[in-house]
Design a protein with these regions (language model features):
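Non-catalytic, mostly N-terminal accessory regions of nucleic-acid modification and defense proteins
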Residues: 1-65, 71
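Conserved S-adenosyl-L-methionine
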Residues: 62-178
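Local beta-strand N-terminus motif with an aromatic residue
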Residues: 79, 185-186
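Short conserved loop adjoining the S-adenosyl-L-methionine
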Residues: 179-184
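Sequence-level detector for tyrosine residue identity
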Residues: 14, 53, 124-127, 147, ...
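Short, charged low-complexity intrinsically disordered segments located at boundaries
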Residues: 31-43, 99-102, 123-131, 186
Length: 186
């Protein structure tokens, strides 16, 4: 219904009877509040919380965006210890490692707008990705640890960290929280 209404409006504005359905797709999002409609162009495609690295998940995974936001709200910095005693599929340790290494959130995914060559030439996406890659530094010292009681989910966390490109920055181990100790104080 929304598509039909938009096309009818465009017909009047551009004095055309027909708009061919060729070229790139431009998905629209429509939200209503009382008597107002807000129309937005979806440039991302898949939701932004899907970073592209998490193939395997635990029963109650936290979204990547929420994990990153919570980490950024803490006093944690890359030179400080970070321990997740219930790491599940590794979202908190992986997001912390990505922050520490300067890996941009969208590095491992694609965006719908990348195919819109007429609006934004692909070279600009390449420039942005090159700039983001230049900021990455995985040759850093970190003390990021993830523990979980479930050995299979620890394997999944390791695999997710590998897919994110930060496996060397995180120590994952199967361990119950009752055995959690560390010589460093946070």
């Amino acid at each position: 219904i929304m598509k039909k209404a938009i096309v009818e409006r465009l017909k009047g504005v551009y004095h055309q009877e027909w708009f061919p359905e060729t070229g790139a797709s431009f998905p629209l999002r429509v939200a209503f509040m009382k008597d107002e409609a807000v129309i937005g162009l979806d440039t991302s495609g898949v939701s932004l919380h899907k970073r592209g690295y998490r193939q395997l998940t635990a029963k109650a995974p936290i979204t990547e965006t929420l994990a990153a936001a919570l980490i950024l709200l803490t006093p944690w910095k890359k030179d400080r210890i970070l321990v997740d005693p219930f790491c599940g599929s590794g979202t908190f340790p992986i997001e912390a490692a990505m922050i520490a290494a300067g890996i941009a959130p969208g590095m491992n995914r694609s965006f719908l707008a990348e195919d819109w060559k007429d609006l934004l030439p692909r070279k600009y996406w390449y420039y942005a990705m090159d700039e983001a890659r230049e900021r990455v530094n995985t040759n850093i010292e970190t003390d990021i640890q993830g523990y979980d009681l479930d050995g299979e989910i620890v394997k999944a966390a390791r695999e997710n960290a590998k897919l994110a490109g930060v496996e060397q920055l995180i120590h994952f181990q199967q361990r119950p929280v009752s055995q959690l100790n560390h010589p460093k104080k946070y």
